[in-house]
Amino acid sequence: MKKFCIIANRDKDENLTITQTMLEFLEANGKTVYVTEESCLEGSYTDVSGIPKDVECAIVLGGDGTILQAAHDLLQLDIPILGVNLGTLGFLAEIETLTMKQAFSKLFLNQYNIESRMMIDATVFKEGQSLSSHKVSAINDVVITRSGFSRIIGVSIFINGEVVQNYRGDGVIISTPTGSTGYNLSAGGPIVTPKAEMIMITPICPHSLNARSIIVTSDDTVEIQIRESKKTQEEEAIVTVDGSFSMELQANDRILIKKAKERVKLVRLEGHSFFHLLRTKFGDK
């Protein structure tokens, strides 16, 4: 790899010290580096839309939220992403700041792989009509939760048009394998290797003894319907995609979820397996 761009979260790297160190290190090794305006250093700057198509890798400094946002911004450019963890757990990040230079040495020696990971599309239906303007893609998850301080909500889960679960609770998470270590994990859902092609459906605090996580193939379609409550209110629930896009839902609204055509590409260095990452993040030796 010879051409890079750097996207930094200034809330995580306030004085851009880490960004500056990385820029100098890459340029000292003969690499061409672009830095987004949000990162604002000296040199060749560009916003995300102006990043040249021949950039081979986007280096993102921040937590998982920063990496997710950058991945969405760069999706149409099809640029692989290498995350540098400035957050807490950082499951999407490949590099820790303390081992940054050693990690980049592997990159320069072509000791890496590019993982192509599946995404999911979510389309909202209101009164039976698809809101095409509200079709969004998720790298991690689509989360449907109760609105504000409302009561628990009722949901119906359909797979390929067939109802499989009805329950009341705080909501439901539909996640990709990449998102299985996020909110899905916190809600008691399964951990799935990110190379898998499947969709996880995990209830959030269900008021039921029978509601459990369900795993389906990537060829299946999942549909969530908001059920009517005894005391219907204007805003029953909220759907959130990758922690950013959100939309209010009413009773009988539906969300159709299926595998997306787009895929996100993440750089993985040799010797950094998913299971090694799990042991490291969870503190197991």
Curated annotation (Swiss-Prot):
One of the GO biological process terms? NAD metabolic process
Give the domain of life: Bacteria
Q: Which GO terms describe its molecular function?
A: ATP binding; metal ion binding; NAD binding; NAD+ kinase activity
Q: What is its EC number?
A: 2.7.1.23
UniProt entry keywords in alphabetical sequence: ATP-binding, Cytoplasm, Kinase, NAD, NADP, Nucleotide-binding, Transferase
Q: TM spans, by residue?
A: none
Q: Briefly, what is this protein's role?
A: Involved in the regulation of the intracellular balance of NAD and NADP, and is a key enzyme in the biosynthesis of NADP. Catalyzes specifically the phosphorylation on 2'-hydroxyl of the adenosine moiety of NAD to yield NADP.
Protein name per UniProt: NAD kinase
| Name of encoding gene | nadK
